[in-house]
């Protein structure tokens, strides 16, 4: 409804020569100077409140320089970068953590199947940002959590040892506690469950997502 109702706002601002980006009722106006920004803010307020009879949230409406970063739709847009807002990354990791509890008792494949839609949705939305480092860190952390789940599902070290032998491991077996979070980053766990193994299980790999792309339907 907001998109339809605010079409008139979009058109009038464009006719006045302003470059805007809007999603629902979140609006970003791009200007070349502070004076131009003040003018655009005044005109936008006049259209929204005077013509469309809407209220403008003065606490959220402000002018800032791109060097300081502009927060918009979960990303922070700067002169030289666009990054995911830290609070969005924290919330995303909290969801992943909730879905990868070691006491869940679900088969690892079921956990991965449940994770993939969330991973796809998040990465597709935020691939506009320069997020390759953040995606790589999350992918590594998530694989460790999944290794921890599988270790607990195996329960006994003998099952891990058998799995390792079946997959070509010929070294000695160091002591490993199957329920320890630290064990999930051990050499034995990494050998038993390499990154390629998770690819075979179909885990969506955030490291493969191309980031830092901007697609605009507004540009002419």
Regions found by a protein language model. Name each.
Residues 1-220:
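Non-catalytic terminal/accessory segments
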């Amino acid at each position: 409804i907001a998109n339809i109702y605010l079409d008139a706002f979009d058109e009038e601002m464009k006719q006045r020569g302003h470059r805007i980006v809007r999603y629902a009722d979140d609006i970003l106006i791009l200007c070349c100077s502070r004076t131009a920004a003040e003018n655009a803010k005044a005109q936008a307020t006049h259209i929204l409140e005077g013509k469309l009879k809407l209220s403008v949230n003065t606490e959220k409406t402000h002018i800032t320089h791109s060097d300081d970063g502009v927060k918009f739709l979960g990303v922070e847009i700067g002169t030289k970068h666009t990054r995911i807002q830290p609070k969005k990354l924290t919330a995303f990791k909290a969801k992943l953590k909730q879905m990868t509890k070691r006491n869940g008792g679900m088969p690892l494949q079921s956990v991965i199947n449940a994770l993939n839609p969330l991973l796809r949705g998040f990465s597709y939305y935020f691939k506009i940002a320069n997020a390759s480092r953040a995606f790589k860190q999350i992918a590594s952390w998530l694989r460790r959590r999944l290794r921890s789940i599988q270790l607990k599902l195996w329960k006994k070290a003998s099952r891990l040892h058998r799995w390792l032998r079946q997959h070509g491991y010929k070294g000695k077996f160091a002591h490993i506690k199957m329920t320890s979070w630290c064990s999930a980053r051990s050499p034995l766990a990494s050998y038993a469950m390499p990154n390629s193994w998770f690819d075979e299980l179909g885990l969506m790999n955030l490291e493969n997502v191309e980031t830092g792309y901007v697609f605009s339907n507004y540009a002419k």
